């Protein structure tokens, strides 16, 4: 036990030395200890950096820390902010979990492989496990974005059906399906690797997936097919949003199913004739004003909100596309042109492109911060250690009061908190009165404030 503790201590000291020490400092005893440890286990070898400090390794450590921390903030925000409790943000939280696990389990071991010149320094049975985790979390990220794009399109195309079946339970079921597909793609890797080590080792030293058939099939299933679905659904989403916005802008709405266009025109014409006969002296300005009031402002605001959300998700999708496309394209080319391509160049490109893909896991929280006010405020509070959940002010019940409204449209009721007596303001004496019961009102208690309520009399 003492020897194991000393070995672990020596390894950690030496790992820090790999990151910050210069080569002219004498650390040969520590290097010799760690070299002996790995030489006795798996024949690994240590290559000490030459000349200057290993700044690339330090930058990778910073990327790992930012990836883990940023995605933890996303998970906290969706968990604690009630405004973020919807299906899309549940998907984003699950995506953040996958990205956080990339930073915890995949990126550190990849950094370790870089520090040892891509010679696997750990026990050999851990190599297929690490590759499987890499494929699992990367595939999960892609599948989450694909599921989000499909969910957004359905929500915009059929909002009534989507809202009817879009509960928290349904969202969790969809997320479970995404993870099940990702696990199904990654599970064969440890099975293949433990049976035949040549499938996960190159030159018996470098831990990398070395099965051409699995590389081809896995790349298409885990990346290119979901990518095609995302591109199509995102284009359709933009098309539907633009069409709905244009229809509302010109005062048209989509006709309900089962009603013909002639029937709608007839109804509109009859309605217009009745209004003209009932109000022959109504001026043209009043008609225009009514037409503007009938325009569904709430629907237009909802479309604007959907457009903003689609913009943020589109940026996430575009960043993901830019980050992962080089790796998967190079991965396919390395298999298809195995004899004609320069394999050493392909290996170097893959080593660079895979880290560009890893960086994508840390960029998503930055996108949310820049383009979403709720996430930005939540992140700011959490970084200042402010985890308090906003509570609603206490409510107080106002006694039931009967009132007669003399206005055919609205009734203004001023309630003074220090007396609890409603004061009714008559809007007009020219229109017939409508008897109305004012029900119990629950309003926040604030003795120094005066609350003015506008209550519809219909």
Curated annotation (Swiss-Prot):
Subcellular location: Cell membrane
Keywords in alphabetical order: Behavior, Cell membrane, Disulfide bond, G-protein coupled receptor, Glycoprotein, Membrane, Receptor, Signal, Transducer, Transmembrane, Transmembrane helix
Intrachain disulfide bonds: 127-207, 337-341
Bias (Basic residues): 287-297
Glycosylated residues (UniProt): 39, 204
Secretion signal span: 1-32
Activity regulation behaviour: Inhibited by inverse agonist ritanserin.
Short motif PDZ-binding, span: 456-458
Domain of life: Eukaryota
Reported modifications of this chain: N-glycosylated.
Effect of residue 223 to L: Decreased binding to inverse agonist ritanserin
Effect of residue 158 to S: In RNA edited version
Outcome recorded upon mutating residue 354 to N: Decreased binding to inverse agonist ritanserin
Entry keyword annotation includes Ribosomal protein: no
Span(s) of short sequence motif NPxxY motif: 364-368
Annotated phenotype, changing residue 218 to A/S: Decreased binding to inverse agonist ritanserin
Outcome recorded upon mutating residue 456 to T: No effect on interaction with MPDZ
Membrane topology: Multi-pass membrane protein
Physiological role: G-protein coupled receptor for 5-hydroxytryptamine (serotonin). Also functions as a receptor for various drugs and psychoactive substances, including ergot alkaloid derivatives, 1-2,5,-dimethoxy-4-iodophenyl-2-aminopropane (DOI) and lysergic acid diethylamide (LSD). Ligand binding causes a conformation change that triggers signaling via guanine nucleotide-binding proteins (G proteins) and modulates the activity of downstream effectors.
Name of protein: 5-hydroxytryptamine receptor 2C
Organism (species): Homo sapiens
Protein's gene: HTR2C
